[in-house]
């Protein structure tokens, strides 16, 4: 059977392939009870570069190690985190594909260390050759979601640009904490509406990672493959790496910097060693400040444009709300006028009915009086007729 723990010096898939013959020997000759899906075709795939971002202590470094299949990054189970600068490590999969992983310090906060954050972002892109293929936003299931993490997408859009979400995969670490609480992953997300707001813009791309060394090899291989499937999906949907243009620009600036360095070296005989060192130091500082200034200007521009966009959105929403209120008042007024008209018509109708009833009543009284008068006249006529007959007899 596969080893229950992963050797530190071998990638997951390499271990799986190494142990596959031993697994085969332990199976029945007829292969009963075995269902295997295995595709060992050495299909050429381009190198992929993955960027790990998230709060310090969420397990970014451990996740990077799981992806690479070796302890490439320093990782300790503590909230403060151990990564202090961007670092790139690589591994080659059994199919020949190269996977590059960039680990970062916490890059959520826009203040007070904006300059440090910008320096590290520049370093991220200087480490990549063809841009970034996927951004892995790492959360820990054992930690409560902080206010800083709730605004993660906003911060990342400001720092990396609004298109960052098209390249994002959400990675959840510390799966074992769910087992301790007796919850399923789906139940956890159902009770966390903030995560729904984060996952929706990312097309619900999410992977559950177990980074502990005692995790089964098969589980580690499965979670890494699930992640890489998402990476290929992102590459297919977007057609190119993220910020490849910026990476090329940084490398072009570095090339220009190296040319300047060479020019200084060629002037070696014209200046003292101290003067040469000072010139080199000044040039390095100027180059770094130039890149940093450009990056900070981009971040400030993004912040300003975001602020203006939000203000415009609020203005439009306020205008729309006022328009709705105006229309509601107009409808209410029209409704009130209609109700008043209906009430007036009903009052007139009731008054008309009352008058009609009164007229009928009066008419009935007149008819009754006429009938009485007619009966009296008839009686008088009868009496008169009788009186005449009596006179004739006499």
UniProtKB/Swiss-Prot annotation:
Residues 45-251 form the AIG1-type G domain. SUPFAM superfamilies: P-loop containing nucleoside triphosphate hydrolases. Residues 54-61 are annotated as: G1. GO terms for molecular function: GTP binding. InterPro entries: G_AIG1, GIMA/IAN/Toc, P-loop_NTPase. Keywords: Coiled coil, GTP-binding, Nucleotide-binding. It comes from the Eukaryota. The keyword Nucleotide-binding applies. Residues 103-106 are annotated as: G3. Residues 210-212 are annotated as: G5. This is Immune-associated nucleotide-binding protein 12. The lineage of its organism: Eukaryota, Viridiplantae, Streptophyta, Embryophyta, Tracheophyta. The gene is IAN12.
């Amino acid at each position: 059977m596969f080893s229950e723990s992963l050797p530190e010096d071998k990638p997951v898939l390499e271990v799986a392939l190494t142990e596959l013959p031993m697994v085969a020997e332990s199976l029945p000759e007829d292969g009963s009870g075995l269902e295997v899906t295995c595709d060992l075709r050495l299909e050429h795939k381009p190198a992929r570069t993955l960027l790990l971002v998230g709060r310090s202590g969420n397990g970014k470094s451990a996740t990077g190690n799981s992806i690479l299949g070796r302890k490439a990054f320093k990782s300790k189970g503590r909230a403060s985190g151990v990564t202090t600068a961007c670092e790139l490590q690589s591994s080659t999969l059994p199919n020949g594909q190269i996977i590059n992983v960039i680990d970062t310090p916490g890059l959520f906060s826009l203040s007070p260390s904006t300059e440090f954050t910008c320096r590290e972002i520049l370093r991220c892109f200087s480490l990549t050759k063809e841009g970034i293929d996927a951004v892995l936003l790492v959360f820990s299931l054992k930690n409560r979601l902080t206010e800083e993490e709730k605004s993660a997408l906003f911060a990342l859009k400001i720092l990396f640009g609004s298109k960052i979400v098209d390249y994002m995969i959400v990675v959840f670490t510390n799966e074992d904490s769910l087992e301790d609480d007796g919850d399923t992953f789906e139940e956890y997300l159902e009770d966390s509406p903030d995560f729904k707001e984060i996952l929706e813009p990312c097309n619900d791309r999410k992977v559950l990672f177990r980074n502990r060394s005692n995790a089964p090899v098969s589980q580690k291989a499965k979670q890494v493959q699930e992640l890489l499937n998402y990476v290929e999906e992102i590459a297919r949907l977007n057609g190119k790496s993220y910020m490849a243009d910026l990476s090329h620009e940084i490398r072009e600036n570095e090339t220009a910097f190296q040319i300047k360095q060479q020019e200084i070296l060629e002037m070696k005989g014209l200046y003292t060693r101290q003067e040469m060192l000072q010139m080199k130091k000044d040039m390095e500082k100027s180059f770094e400040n130039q890149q940093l200034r450009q990056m900070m200007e981009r971040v400030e521009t993004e912040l300003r444009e975001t602020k203006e966009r939000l203000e415009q959105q609020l203005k439009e929403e306020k205008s729309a709300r006022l328009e709705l209120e105006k229309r509601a008042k107009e409808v209410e007024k029209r409704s009130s006028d209609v109700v008043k008209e209906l009430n007036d018509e009903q009052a007139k109708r009731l008054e008309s009915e009352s008058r009609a009833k009164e007229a009928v009543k009066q008419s009935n009284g007149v008819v009754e009086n006429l009938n009485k008068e007619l009966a009296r006249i008839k009686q008088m006529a009868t009496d008169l007729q009788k009186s005449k007959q009596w006179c004739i007899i006499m």
